[in-house]
Every structure is written in structure tokens, then in C-alpha cells.
Amino acid sequence: MNIIKFFHIIHNLYFKQKYFIKRKYYSSEGEDLFLKEKLNLKKKGFYVDVGAYHPIRHNNTMILYQNGWRGINIDANEFSIDLFNFIRPEDENFNIAISDKSEKIDFYSSKKHDPQSTANKIFLKHDYIDKNRKYKKKEIEAKTLNDVLKNSKYNGQQIDFLNIDVQGYDYKVLKSLDFKVYKPKYICIEIQFINEKEIMDFLEYNKYQRIWTGINSNIFEKIE
């Protein structure tokens, strides 16, 4: 790691986010507080976080990590994965986009580390163009979630908690996972104005019921 990248990581984690201060929660809407009550944290579990963005800020899996859980963090932003590699070296961290097929996709963001980065053109218009926000476009590689899992040490392992937050690409992420193999017990997903019906129908078809609702986030539980 070069010295400039190391400085940016330290500045972000210790000066901006104050990593050294342990918190009761890290999520933006209280998702992790609900999960902490719902999940048996005495048992070590396996999570997958797609659109992980930051290991501390607005993060739904940091509390799980602190309680011995381990998993996979995925983000299309390179700096996001630099942060995860620094803070969570025991996780597997992948700098890649997730879609319903392996392909090259256009990725839009306004700055180096943007929580609103998106590959969805409807979201781009709503959150960037209509608000006169400047953005940059670049072409990046996308794989299916199945492909990432198959090439990880968790191949074939049931997912205890799946978190998806990819600004309008959430439905494509869901479709990229084999639910007969990985069978997530709990799913947290943002449902905004894009693909709401498709997401709800998909989860209902796969026997999930909604058990918690925030401003944008929704948590679903697998019905046995």
C-alpha cells in the first residue's frame, strides 16, 4: 500500500469516522439494533454485504463482526474495499459490481467515495441529473453474486444475513443469487421507487416475509 492511500485510510477512519470510539450501533436507520435483538449473536454467523460502502459509517454488519461473525463485503468503489481490507482483514472483500449476469456496466458517481454511486439510469436521473449534481461515468466489471460466492471460501454455505444497498440495482442483485443453495435467513434491502413490485414479488415467491421497515431499508425473514 502506498503512503498516500494509507494516509487517506487513516484520515477517513480515525479523524472523520472516529473508529476508536466503540458505538452501540453503526447503521443509518437502526437496522443493526433490530438485528442484534433478532439474531443469536452468541452463535457465529455468515453475512454477505453488497454495496457495503464503508466498514463503519451507515454499516449494518459492523456489530456482527464485533461479535465474531465473518463474511463477504462487496463494493464497486475501490476506496471502500481499501477501508474494509484495513479494518476487517478477516472478511473477504471484493472490489466489483454485482448484476444478474457477468458483463461490463456503466457506473456513475460524483466523487471518489460516494454513497450514492449507482449503475441504474433511473436512479441517476432522480439523484444526479434532476438535482443538477455533477457526476462521472466509468465502465466497470460486474459479476453475479453466485460467481463471487463460488470463488470464495464460503462456496455453498448458507447465508445467515444478506444486506443489499446498491441504489436501484437491488433487484438485479437478488436475481443473481441461487436461493436454493444459499437460502439467506434474513435479508435487509433498500426499497425505494425502483423495482418495488418486482422485489416484493420476488421475495414473496421465495417465501420471505417483511418483519421490519425503516425509511428506505426493509428486513425480511425466511419462512420455514
Which role does the model predict for each range below?
Residues 1-224:
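Phosphate/nucleotide-binding beta-alpha loop and adjacent structural elements of enzyme active sites
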